[in-house]
Amino acid sequence: ISMAALLEAQDLHASYGGPAILKGISFTVGEGGITTVLGANGAGKTTLLRAICGMCQRRGRVQFAGQAIENKATEDVVRLGVAHVPDGRGTFLHLTTEENLRLGAYTRHRDKTGIAHDLERVFGYFPKLKERRKQQAGTLSGGEQQMLAISRGLMLRPKLMLLDEPSFGLAPLIVQDIFRIMRAINQQDKVSILLVEQNAELALDLADT
């Protein structure tokens, strides 16, 4: 069954002001699907995700849910329903787990009931975070910080999650657990996923395309 395209890029070029890092990239992410981008360090995988979000210089055509987003600011892309979970986890280390999660819902700060519901939903996926909700994020293990980064992205109620190397630096059992939960998020919450990954075996097992 072919899926309708949620995200579509055509002839995408990206740079940080110097030579182009991405040249003429075209791809689609199906609505409700999981698409994987594989490649070694330095291949431009992280730049691809940043280009979608407007975090670097770009040209080409990028459409999300039928809207052109190649000229939109990062915050406007986020408001459309794109959650970017960067490599290095990107958590605010001095804040508690729960404060980090609430920051993830900053675009919906008036929706107190919905935010409370979504907190319980992510704690259902990641029970360890519930145990550590009052703990400073900087004292969490690497695996817990990755769970927190994914959960913070979920607090946006995204249509699409961009995941940058979620397995990096983590023990294999923790990685398997995180990938299992990502599949559940995809299937139960109907969140599409664009996954950048070096671990080809795990990534291809998770992906539709």
Regions picked out by a protein language model, each given a short descriptive name:
Residues 4-209:
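Glycine-rich phosphate-binding loops of nucleotide-dependent enzymes
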